[in-house]
Amino acid sequence: MTEATRILLGVNIDHVATLRQARGTRYPDPVKAALDAEEAGADGITVHLREDRRHIQERDVRMLKEVLQTRMNFEMGVTEEMLAFAEEIRPAHSCLVPERREELTTEGGLDVAGQEQRIRDAVRRLAAVGSEVSLFIDPDPRQIEASARVGAPAIELHTGRYADAENPGEQARELQRVREGVALGRSLGLIVNAGHGLHYHNVEPVAAIEGINELNIGHAIVAHALFVGFRQAVAEMKALMLAAAAKR
């Protein structure tokens, strides 16, 4: 595998916790899912500690920090509460995301261009505790350029519009937006990741884009795991990604 064909899989385990929280039980354990994902080939584990604590809890994050063999990618809103928690936990990676209580899932990218100083301050605080920061943004040149200006070393391009496209033409246009976003981000010296809405039937065109470092995928893997088991679900996704990246 060359640098050009290398691609990483970050497995988001939020929805293992969603199932647990639905009944207020101690199972299924997202930490167990994370360890299984690592054994199946995951390159990192992503968790989003939301303001309303609808799935992942602080205890999960603390336990993951202690036991992961790979690395944690801590998704968080840009709030004082979350920044203080991240400074305590010191995750290897942090991803700043927009957040609204009423949304089912993150609906769009962070408006970096509209709040550059606020994001710059957050990036500096996280970097000071050794956390590599990425910004979850739409594949919009204005947002990508702003991300570079505020000092973030990485971005994660929101692939939701590609994933939700209702016809092949729309999907092709959205995929091209992602391609152009990757190229612009790389030209500005950014590490470029991507994610949101990716599943077993749409991941390959994104994984085949030259310059993408990592894909973060959760819901599709957790759903598929109901039928094949968590390790198998992770292994199948990683295999699809590697096969697509090999064709770059």
Swiss-Prot record:
Positions of 3-amino-2-oxopropyl phosphate binding: 12, 23, 197, 218-219
Family matches, as InterPro entries: Aldolase_TIM, PyrdxlP_synth_PdxJ, Pyridoxine-5'_phos_synth
GO molecular function: pyridoxine 5'-phosphate synthase activity
GO cellular component terms listed in the entry, alphabetical order: cytosol
Coarse class of the protein's main subcellular location: cytoplasm
Enzyme superclass (EC): transferase
Enzyme Commission numbers on file: 2.6.99.2
Metabolic or biological pathway, per its Swiss-Prot or TrEMBL entry: Cofactor biosynthesis; pyridoxine 5'-phosphate biosynthesis; pyridoxine 5'-phosphate from D-erythrose 4-phosphate: step 5/5
Residues annotated for 1-deoxy-D-xylulose 5-phosphate binding in this entry: 14-15, 50, 55, 105
SUPFAM superfamilies: Pyridoxine 5'-phosphate synthase
Pfam families with a match to the protein in the record: PdxJ
Active site: 48 (proton acceptor), 75 (proton acceptor), 196 (proton donor)
BP terms from Gene Ontology: pyridoxine biosynthetic process
Marked site positions, Transition state stabilizer: 156
Subcellular location: Cytoplasm
UniProt KW keywords: Cytoplasm, Pyridoxine biosynthesis, Transferase
Reactions this protein catalyses: 3-amino-2-oxopropyl phosphate + 1-deoxy-D-xylulose 5-phosphate = pyridoxine 5'-phosphate + phosphate + 2 H2O + H(+)
Family to which this protein belongs: Belongs to the PNP synthase family.
NCBIfam families: pdxJ, PRK05265.1-1, PRK05265.1-3, PRK05265.1-5
Its biological purpose: Catalyzes the complicated ring closure reaction between the two acyclic compounds 1-deoxy-D-xylulose-5-phosphate (DXP) and 3-amino-2-oxopropyl phosphate (1-amino-acetone-3-phosphate or AAP) to form pyridoxine 5'-phosphate (PNP) and inorganic phosphate.
Subunit structure: Homooctamer; tetramer of dimers.
Identification of the protein by name: Pyridoxine 5'-phosphate synthase
Gene giving rise to this polypeptide: pdxJ
